[in-house]
Amino acid sequence: KDGKWTFYFPNGRIEKCVNYKKDTLNGAYLVMNADSTINTIGNYQSGKKHGDWTWYNENKSLEMEGGCTEGLQHGEWKYYFSSGELSYNANFNRGARSGQWTYFFKDGTLFKEGKYLNDQKEGLWITNYESGVLLMTGVYSKGKEQGIWLNYWENGNIKNKAEFKNGVLNGAWVSYSPNKNILLTGKYKNGLKSGEWKTFNDKNKLLLLENFKVIKSEDSKNEIIVIGRNQE
């Protein structure tokens, strides 16, 4: 095949217009719906997607749009809810997620945002409630949670404080009530509860004291047992 080729629906309307060069897609590429609205529009170069591409959903609203190079997503892309509102902005570097990614609720309020490096989450990421109030914040390193992560009540007070190492819970854990009283304290070791854990009511009264010990089971997997419990 060479040059422009046009395909038709049984009703005679155009289904697709494409261009070939020596049997390879090359040039403008257009796909239509049966009602003659656009489904997909883009461009090929030597058989691979190249340049700007746009897709529309069944509601005739934008579904996604962005650029390609040698068949790979490259640069900024935008994705939309089926009702037409912007869902998220994304960035790619030759097919790999790279740079800022920002997600939105339908009303445009920021949902979550952060960065990718070499297709992995990197640095500070935040997540919000639909009201716009901060829900969660923490740092990624090579795609894994690292350091202190904070989870918030919708009134802005801290709900949980946790420590991670290479994506696994390691270190202190503290849970708080909406009015800042401590509800739970303890430590994790390699993702499992370890040592003394205390549970309180919202009036700071100790309700439960537990001690955890990690042992190796017969199949060499870590198991956790409660070796002491004192319930008030």
For each of these PLM feature ranges, what is it?
Residues 1-232:
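Glycine/tyrosine- and acidic-biased, solvent-exposed loop/turn segments at the edges of beta-strands
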